[in-house]
């Protein structure tokens, strides 16, 4: 059976996590390496913005400062995610690889099958969603599922985003364990109070977390084990535990210094 790398990381800052993900992508391009799966968490609450989001228009930086929330821009698209009580995954690999090949949506579907099996390993029956249009778009990622994202009883529990460079992709996503809705709605701006209250009122019908659908609370280790097994079964691969290479560490530090820790990157839109 084919072998992929698995990196099991602890907590990093938002900027560090984005720098590491991009470093893995860039080094995969440089070295044509095997696909990599990484699990990680966050040292403090972090609001990550999609690549094209407008930080000044959509983020309440005053509230972020009061609440100790870091703000970072992702290299991937999509909408804002508040990372706190979650396990985050990232996958890097070649789109020429048969297990990751195809269009963006086709590779999304292949990755989502592993996520679906991860939920099943926790005793949670999820579904792979078909995207739906909404007339009341907000900055919030979990406000509505996109194509091939994971839902449970119609509520989005895993949100993902992807970027491609040449023949390689990076996809990362939030596996939400529990959600602080109050904090999420405090750190984002809305067009009006009416819009904010309308979206918030419907939010619980559209978004959920693992602990909303289980009679017991899982440890982080149990959740990691469930999703690692899910990806292994979904992709039909073995994972070998790995660490960042010297070049990956050096590049992540460079990206942190020159990109993800800079105001130029955060406020580029």
UniProtKB/Swiss-Prot annotation:
Residues 31-239 form the BPL/LPL catalytic domain. GO terms for molecular function: lipoyl(octanoyl) transferase activity. Its EC number is 2.3.1.181. Keywords: Acyltransferase, Transferase. Pfam families: LplA-B_cat. Pathway: Protein modification; protein lipoylation via endogenous pathway; protein N(6)-(lipoyl)lysine from octanoyl-[acyl-carrier-protein]. It catalyses: octanoyl-[ACP] + L-lysyl-[protein] = N(6)-octanoyl-L-lysyl-[protein] + holo-[ACP] + H(+). The keyword Cell division does not apply. PROSITE patterns: BPL_LPL_CATALYTIC. Catalyzes the transfer of endogenously produced octanoic acid from octanoyl-acyl-carrier-protein onto the lipoyl domain of GcvH, an intermediate carrier during protein lipoylation. Belongs to the octanoyltransferase LipM family. In the reaction, the free carboxyl group of octanoic acid is attached via an amide linkage to the epsilon-amino group of a specific lysine residue of lipoyl domains of lipoate-dependent enzymes. The reaction proceeds via an octanoyl-thioester enzyme intermediate. This is Octanoyltransferase LipM.
